[in-house]
Amino acid sequence: MATATSKPKAVERIKMRIRKGDTVQVIAGKDKGKTGAVLRTLPNENRVIVEGVNMRTRHEKPSQEGESGRIVTEEASLHASNVMLYSTDKKVASRVEIVVEKDGTKKRKLKKTGEVLD
């Protein structure tokens, strides 16, 4: 008789105010202080992939005869709480607030600089 396996518990989602293409700064971990553009967001896992940050090496087997294997470096994901939006003009990281315009649209605004992102 087979045993029942439990499903992994769903991660509680946090509000991610980070989007693809944003410039962020890492505020915790081994890459603290580095900045880069967000390549991809994983909202169900509360994680982001940042260009040039948290690099991992992976060994690939050869795909064809006569071809040698290789070592590939690629970005691994970071938890969204470990990055903060970064103002490239003022060179400072800042928290984000959501501002509702008079026409009802929502915009993201950096609290320190007042810079509107959307």
From Swiss-Prot:
| Gene Ontology MF, one | rRNA binding
**Per UniProt, which keywords does this protein have?**
Ribonucleoprotein, Ribosomal protein, RNA-binding, rRNA-binding
What function does this protein fulfil? One of two assembly initiator proteins, it binds directly to the 5'-end of the 23S rRNA, where it nucleates assembly of the 50S subunit. One of the proteins that surrounds the polypeptide exit tunnel on the outside of the subunit.
Family annotation (NCBIfam families): rplX_bact (TIGR01079)
Q: Signal as a keyword?
A: no
Example GO BP: translation
Quaternary arrangement and interactors, per the entry? Part of the 50S ribosomal subunit.
Task: State the similarity comment.
Answer: Belongs to the universal ribosomal protein uL24 family.
An example GO CC term for this entry is: ribonucleoprotein complex
Q: Which Pfam families match?
A: KOW, ribosomal_L24
- Source species, domain of life: Bacteria
Entry-linked SUPFAM superfamilies: Translation proteins SH3-like domain
Full protein name: Large ribosomal subunit protein uL24
